Amino acid sequence: QRQRCIRDRLVAVILSAQCTDKRVNMTTPALFEAYPTPEAMAQATAEEIYAYIKSISYPNNKARNLAAMARMLCTEFGGVVPSDLDALQRLPGVGRKTANVVGAVIWGKEVMPVDTHVFRVSARIGLTRGAKTPLQTELQLEKNIPSHLLPVAHHWLILHGRYVCTARAPKCDACGIA
């Protein structure tokens, strides 16, 4: 049961790239019902998976990645999502940010996933200086935020970016940080 939860979170994070959580949460129940295990998903074609995720952004690429990821989970990891971040990044569709999200959320690893909100907010409020890439941002944040707070600080920065420090019309007058 725990492995299913971990696999479901990994799939949801893969699907969330350039997509809203709301859309992902609307899409995943049917996907997980159709493919309740990595073994079941590994037997599916990308076209079959596409039918369940077509309302998600970039569904063709994500369907191919999910099928290949499930096959690799089964062949190389015994159907178990690896906890090692480097091993996670070997899976199709899993880059540094996705691996860091899974590491922080599932295993409480002291890492800082950097999405567009984290990148923007950390620069605006001065947690980073001159960072031009997500990796530079991640490394600066890991120096500037106590390590035990990194897994939750990621969520704080995302929420602040979604609701206060928005990209187009930041609510600086409502910001308790600025």
Range-by-range predicted roles:
Residues 1-3, 7-178:
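Catalytic cores of DNA base-excision repair glycosylases
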